[in-house]
Regions:
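Conserved PLP-enzyme active-site core in the AAT-like
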Residues: 1-182, 189
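Conserved C-terminal alpha-helix-loop-beta "cap" of PLP-dependent enzymes
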Residues: 185-255
Length: 255
């Protein structure tokens, strides 16, 4: 509502950040951002009017993993009624059991791993008992209803989710380990890879890994070099919507 405050990780998916800065701001809702590795120090950013704390773990593009228990405990100690949300797309809602960690609402782009075949678009939101009536009513009032075909396709994807995620884990780790040893690569950001930011929290809190990770080249490419680099991949296509059976790559400048 007007006058409320949202506290969001600065590694949230860019459209999520844009929704706050370009839409909610016009409705009188302010947003501030915090470092994904802040842990219990998040208390320094909480305000009396903080109503939403928005997490995404691992972070978009740069893949930092939150210390979720520390964040949740800190938020509850200062603004106990604030709703803690997480974008749980990377973990497909199953590799990280968000509600078990005290999070109120867990959302994901089910277009990715739940559908699993890049042939439908759907989002999901699950919540605890405290938030259920509010979530149900707002989804109803905003007309957020899935069509029958998409519901069927998503339920089909759920049948193979476990075996697909195990393969994503294995394949992505093999590729990331190979890249980590490559002379042209400065850093690999994969939560399951030792040395990645927040790896210890992934190891403690997650039950596996999906297939999305990032890496940084030692040389910063200009536009022509980058286009040539991407155009010469034979096994990876360039596209946004990961989570299917294809191998995809996308260039990004998160700074």
């Amino acid at each position: 509502e007007q006058g409320d405050h949202v506290l969001m990780t600065n590694t949230a998916y860019e459209p999520s950040q844009d929704f706050c800065s370009k839409i909610l701001s016009k409705l009188g809702v302010t947003t501030s951002w915090f470092d994904p590795l802040i842990g219990a120090d998040i208390v320094k950013h909480l305000q009396p009017n903080t109503k939403i704390v928005f997490l995404e773990s691992p972070g978009s593009i740069t893949m930092e993993v939150h210390d979720v228990p520390a964040i949740v405990a800190a938020v509850r100690s200062v603004v106990p009624d604030a709703i803690i949300m997480i974008d749980n797309t990377w973990a497909a809602g199953v590799l990280f059991k968000a509600l078990d960690f005290g999070i109120d609402v867990s959302i994901q782009a089910a277009t990715k791993y739940l559908v699993g075949h890049s042939d439908a678009m759907i989002g999901t939101a699950v919540c605890n008992a405290r938030c259920w009536e509010q979530l149900r009513e707002n989804a109803y009032l905003m007309g957020q209803m899935v069509d029958a075909d998409t519901a069927y396709i998503t339920s089909r994807g759920l049948r193979t989710l476990g075996v697909r995620l195990r393969q994503h884990h294995e394949s992505s780790l093999k590729v990331s380990e190979w890249l980590a040893e490559h002379p042209q690569v400065a850093r690999v950001n994969h939560p399951a890879l030792p040395g990645s930011k927040g790896h210890e929290f992934w190891k403690r809190d997650f039950t596996g890994s999906s297939g999305l990770f990032s890496f940084v080249l030692k040389k910063k490419l200009n536009d022509e070099e980058l286009a040539n680099y991407l155009d010469n991949f034979s096994l990876f296509s360039m596209a946004y919507s990961w989570g299917g059976y294809e191998s995809l790559i996308l260039a990004n400048q998160p700074e």
